[in-house]
A protein has these predicted regions:
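N-terminal cysteine/histidine-rich coordination modules
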Residues: 6-40, 45-82, 87
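Iron-sulfur-cluster electron-transfer modules
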Residues: 25-28, 32-35, 65, 70-257
Length: 258
């Protein structure tokens, strides 16, 4: 049995008007076209690893998973918590938004984006995985998913530089260097758990003679878990933080980890 969705407001009742108010502004011409143009050809089926791993269960076909949007619109948002739990189980446990299905769709229907819309709808009703909610809260408070403070981030960078001092004489990890060619960003798990990854990249930049820097303020975390629960507002904030730092430091390019 699939685990129940985390509910931010346990006693919150489902409000049909609230559901429709969430969906209507987002169902523009593009979404309407996608919802109406699907020919149920099944070409997306074999692209889905959930479909293949389940013994080709028809319920795992990507096009079938997004049926909930049309159902909710047809019902004018009049659904119960049990129905939304069914939606949750499908869009979180049977899809990871990899977009393989989108690449193979002859009509270019972005099924992952439709799944994201459903995840955003569930979030508006207080339903999302606890881990994602915690990460989103960390983004909002600290600017990164791992709740790393500015002080800890800078201290980690300085420690990495010190650790490599004997191995590579003259190696520096510039912080807030204006006019550098590259601003390097990382996965927030690196300063938290894997600082050696930062050190390896620093070695590459040093040997290559690259002109680079890292920002001290929010914008150094290049992950964006908010988009995986349909939180567009927070997802936008994360990206804007990175662009803001790049503009402030007047760099030419932004490079990301991995």
């Amino acid at each position: 049995m699939a685990e129940e969705a985390t509910q931010m407001e346990e006693t919150k009742e489902i409000n049909p008007e609230e559901i429709m108010n969430f969906l209507k502004p987002k169902i523009g011409a593009r979404f309407k076209m996608w919802l109406n143009i699907c020919a149920h050809c099944g070409l997306c089926a074999n692209t889905c690893h959930y479909y293949n791993a389940s013994g080709k269960d028809p319920k795992m076909i990507p096009a079938y998973k997004v049926r909930f949007i049309k159902e909710i619109l047809r019902k004018k948002g009049k659904v119960d918590r049990e129905y939304l739990q069914k939606v949750y189980d499908t869009i979180y446990h049977e899809c990871n938004m990899c977009r393989r299905c989108t690449l193979y769709c002859p009509f270019g229907i972005d099924i992952a984006l439709l799944i994201s819309l459903l995840r955003g709808l569930l979030l508006s009703q207080g339903m999302a995985p606890e881990g994602l909610l915690r990460a989103v809260e960390n983004y909002q408070e600290f600017g990164n998913q791992m709740a790393v403070s500015k002080e800890d981030w800078v201290e980690t960078i300085e420690w990495c530089e010190e650790e490599m001092a004997e191995e590579l004489v003259g190696l520096k990890i510039p912080i807030d260097k204006k006019g550098a060619k590259i601003m390097y960003t990382v996965n927030a798990r690196e300063p938290k758990f894997y600082p050696q990854d930062i050190m390896e990249v620093a070695k590459i930049f040093h040997v290559a003679g690259e002109d680079w820097t890292v920002p001290s303020e929010s914008g150094w975390d290049d992950t964006n878990l908010a988009m995986f629960c349909g939180d567009v507002k927070t997802a936008r904030m994360i990206v804007e933080n990175t662009f803001k730092r790049a503009e402030e430091l007047e760099v030419e390019k932004v490079a990301i980890t991995e």
